[in-house]
């Protein structure tokens, strides 16, 4: 909600909005300096504040829903625990151009990480081309400077998946599908009869060595996955590593503190 416009019962409306009966205290809640006119309260809203703890399967739709729930009011997110998007295909936080808030603040506490999810390792079985997938993005910003970021922690794009390879040691031998490793964090392994590893929160999945064929390891925070390669034998498909995700993409936010960032940003 917001304080009613002029003409209207601004005094009682401001009490309902801020919970403060003293004009000076209500002005503080509405981010107005003192002295000021009560008419300046019209149409203003107090900040809506949310605190987010750790969640390694965070759905960015929750974040978007809270923004719309607040209407035009400014909204603040205090991030106190590590967050990882539930999907490499969905940014951790996303703000399209229709986001209604006066402004959106992200306060990322010290030691806290915000992650895009890691990309999957490439595979050559089932028609796969062997290429690792791109890592996930952290923040999609389409509201420009209305997004204000104070990063005392870490914003880390998901690492890309490693490349897979189809290999046989000599003509007449059976083709072997060797999957790539997953990007950090939680990127899936490429699979196949042989495969690199899935990523954990702490690190990317490794590649797999089979004779002279080598699938690529997944990428670390903000890094591309490793290409597959061979140093002998016959190869049918040699996949490249996936690119990292973006830490912040779209339009430039207002940076209060840039802090530590892995991956491209605007």
From Swiss-Prot:
Residue ranges of the motif GRM 9: 223-228
Residue positions of motif GRM 5: 187-191
InterPro entries according to UniProt: Gp38_N, Receptor-recog_Gp38
Motif (GRM 7): 202-209
A GO CC term attached to the entry: virus tail, fiber
Motif, GRM 1: chain positions: 116-123
Keywords: Host-virus interaction, Viral attachment to host cell, Viral tail fiber protein, Viral tail protein, Virion, Virus entry into host cell
Extent of motif GRM 8: 214-220
Cysteine-cysteine disulfides: none
Positions of the record's site feature: Interaction with the fiber protein p37: 9, 22, 37
Locus of motif GRM 10: 232-246
Motif window: GRM 4: 174-184
Pfam families: GP38, Gp38_N
Residue window of motif GRM 3: 157-171
Motif GRM 6 boundaries: 194-200
Span of the annotated motif GRM 2: 126-137
UniProt GO BP: adhesion receptor-mediated virion attachment to host cell; symbiont entry into host cell
Subcellular compartments: Virion
Reported function: Receptor binding protein (RBP) that is at the tip of the long tail fibers and serves as the phage recognition site for the attachment host receptor. Probably uses the host receptor OmpA.
Note: This phage use outer membrane protein ompA as a receptor.
Record comment regarding domains: The N-terminus is involved in binding to the fiber protein p37. The C-terminus contains glycine-rich motifs (GRM) and mediates the host specificity. The glycine-rich motifs assemble into a 3-layered PG(II) sandwich domain.
Protein family per UniProt: Belongs to the receptor-recognizing protein gp38 family.
Protein name: Receptor-recognizing protein gp38
Organism annotation: Enterobacteria phage Ox2
Gene: 38
């Amino acid at each position: 909600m917001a304080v009613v416009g002029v003409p209207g019962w601004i005094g009682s409306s401001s009490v309902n909005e801020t919970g403060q009966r003293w004009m000076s205290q209500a002005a503080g809640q509405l981010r107005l300096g003192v002295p000021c006119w009560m008419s300046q309260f019209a149409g203003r809203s107090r900040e809506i504040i949310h605190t987010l703890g750790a969640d390694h399967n965070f759905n960015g739709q929750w974040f978007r829903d809270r923004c719309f729930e607040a209407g035009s009011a400014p909204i603040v997110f205090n991030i106190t625990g590590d967050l990882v998007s539930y999907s490499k295909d969905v940014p951790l936080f996303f703000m399209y151009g229709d986001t209604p808030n006066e402004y959106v603040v992200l306060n990322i506490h010290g030691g806290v990480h915000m992650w895009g999810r890691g990309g999957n390792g490439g595979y050559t079985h089932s028609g796969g081309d062997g290429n690792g997938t791109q890592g996930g993005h952290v923040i999609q910003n389409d509201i420009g400077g209305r997004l204000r970021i104070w990063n005392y922690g870490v914003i880390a794009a998901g690492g890309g998946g490693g490349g897979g390879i189809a290999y046989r040691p000599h003509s007449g031998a059976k083709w072997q599908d060797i999957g790539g490793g997953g990007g950090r964090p939680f990127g899936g392994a490429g699979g196949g009869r042989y495969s690199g590893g899935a990523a954990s929160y702490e690190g990317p999945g490794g590649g797999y060595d089979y004779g002279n064929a080598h699938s690529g390891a997944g990428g670390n925070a903000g890094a591309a996955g490793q290409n597959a390669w061979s140093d002998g034998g016959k190869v049918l498909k040699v996949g490249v590593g996936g690119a990292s995700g973006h830490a912040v993409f779209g339009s430039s936010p207002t940076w209060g503190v840039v802090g530590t960032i892995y991956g491209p940003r605007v």
